[in-house]
Amino acid sequence: MTHTPRTPLRIVTYNIHRSRGMDRRTRPERVAEVLRHVDADVIALQEVLGAGPSGTSHIEEIGAALGMGWVMAATRHLRGHLFGNAILSRFPAKHHTQHDLSWKACEERCLQRVDVDVNGRVLHVYNVHLGTAILERRYQAQRLATIVADRHVTGPKIVLGDFNEWMRGLTTTLLSAKLKSVDLGQYLRRRRTYPGLFPILHLDHIYYDGPLEIDYIEVLRTRLALVASDHLPLIADIRI
């Protein structure tokens, strides 16, 4: 039997903090330059500003600078702008949906899913930004795990984003029981991603399921990445 060789892909998750850097300057073009250096095929962003009354949309500017298509999943309005998650891709997006993860009176959150057609194979990309409260994250992690486990959604799945958990807590334990977790310690000596300039916490994570292989993991620490946002990009080279 002849097996079709797996397709290599570079994926990145990056909380861009409304394009506001550690120097308190709002520069979406700086975020785009960081991502241009990463040279990823699929990009999952959190804390993204979309269209607003001024017509200035950070995701439009970043997408145009990178020459990539994009889909936004807004959770609320911030100063008149759409605000939430966004996925950019060099490959066609076949399907897009978002699931509400909001809990009680906490800030609105969502799980964004985009199905990307990679040379005839579908990769399900889940982009998430969990809350800061422990009980909130527990609810969100349980709901996330249930959504990703949907048996009607088959094929390789990758779940990545800002999980707002910096040690092996309840959320990490719950998700690791349902999904495969990328052991960053296997690839990285320094795996902390927050805050950008002097990272002391590891908030960004990658989980996956199905026929998918992880080849390489990197936290980008270029001079520009250290100031462009309060997070550092977490990069994964995979094969599907």
What kind of feature is each model-predicted range?
Residues A51-S54, R79-H81:
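Short active-site-adjacent helix-start/loop capping segments
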Residues S19, Q46-G52:
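Active-site neighborhood of divalent metal-dependent phosphoester/pyrophosphate hydrolases
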Residues M1-V42, A64-A65, G69-I240:
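Active-site regions of metal-assisted phosphoester/phosphodiester hydrolases
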Residues S57-E60:
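Short Gly/Thr/Asp-enriched flexible loops that form oxyanion-binding sites at enzyme active sites
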